[in-house]
From Swiss-Prot:
Entries under PANTHER family matching the protein: CYTIDYLATE KINASE (PTHR21299:SF2), CYTIDYLATE KINASE/PANTOATE-BETA-ALANINE LIGASE (PTHR21299)
Record bears the keyword Kinase: yes
Gene Ontology cellular-component terms listed: cytosol
GO biological process terms, semicolon-separated: nucleobase-containing small molecule interconversion; pyrimidine nucleotide metabolic process
The protein's Enzyme Commission number: 2.7.4.25
Compartmental location: Cytoplasm
Chief subcellular location: cytoplasm
Keywords assigned: ATP-binding, Cytoplasm, Kinase, Nucleotide-binding, Transferase
Protein's name according to its UniProt entry: Cytidylate kinase
Catalysis: reaction(s): CMP + ATP = CDP + ADP; dCMP + ATP = dCDP + ADP
GO function terms (MF aspect): ATP binding; CMP kinase activity; dCMP kinase activity
Domain of life: Bacteria
Binding site for ATP: 12-20
Length: 227
């Protein structure tokens, strides 16, 4: 009988630190990694590369079903590999973002990508980062973590990130945007942002990233009986 690969799901709102935690855990455990937030951007970029109409659901479904994408974390840096090519920077362009919002609107595309995400489940295990990983994509995952932080703390972190890149930012505007996104995510009809019933809710508001990683790894190893 083939062993089923264990999955650790990391869900939570924007800016809680999911990506950083996901990369750290994948490196510590030497497991595979899935950044579900990037999947729609990767599909949009693949469509642009292959001249597939991003407004055609029929054309997008087969592309989504066989999307050749991998995520590799090295020293805290995430590489997004599409068809053997590093597209980490390319998926962040405005053109790709616009196309991603189009492809994400199609139900059959979302269903195809759901199956594609589940295919990331390979031995020795998978760390899955998203918003509905523990509730929709991998409801049977043995370890589920819901990483949260106050909206003020998440706005503060985002402000520091943008300032480091040389952008001038308004804290109140950032905070309003985060609260608006939270409200939209938590109240949407399909796959709302809520912790799975069996998830560890980890509030990172007053914790350093090192403390978050330590707590998450300790919990995962305990649940999985890993050395």
């Amino acid at each position: 009988m083939t062993a089923i690969a264990p999955v650790i799901t990391i869900d939570g709102p924007s800016g809680a630190g999911k990506g950083t935690l996901c990369k750290a855990m994948a490196e510590a455990l030497q497991w595979h990694l899935l950044d579900s937030g990037a999947i729609y951007r990767v599909l949009a970029l693949a469509a642009l590369h292959h001249h597939v109409d991003v407004a055609s659901e029929d054309a997008l479904v087969p592309l989504a079903s066989h999307l050749d994408v991998r995520f590799i974390s090295t020293n805290g840096n995430l590489e997004v590999i599409l068809e053997g090519e590093d597209v980490s920077g390319e998926i962040r362009t405005q053109e790709v973002a616009n196309a991603a919002s189009q492809v994400a609107a199609f139900p059959r595309v979302r269903e195809a990508l759901l199956r594609r995400q589940r295919a990331f489940r390979e031995l020795p295990g998978l760390i899955a980062d998203g918003r509905d990983m523990g509730t929709v994509v991998f409801p049977d995952a043995p370890v589920k973590i819901f990483l949260d932080a106050s909206s003020e703390e998440r706005a503060h972190r985002r402000m520091l990130q943008l300032q480091e890149k040389g952008f001038s930012v308004n804290f109140e505007r950032l905070l309003a945007e985060i609260k608006e996104r939270d409200d939209r995510d938590r109240n949407r009809a399909v796959a709302p942002l809520v912790p799975a019933a069996d998830a560890l809710v980890l509030d990172s508001t007053t914790l350093s990233i090192e403390q978050v990683i330590e707590k998450a790894l300790q919990y995962a190893r305990q649940k999985l009986a890993l050395a």
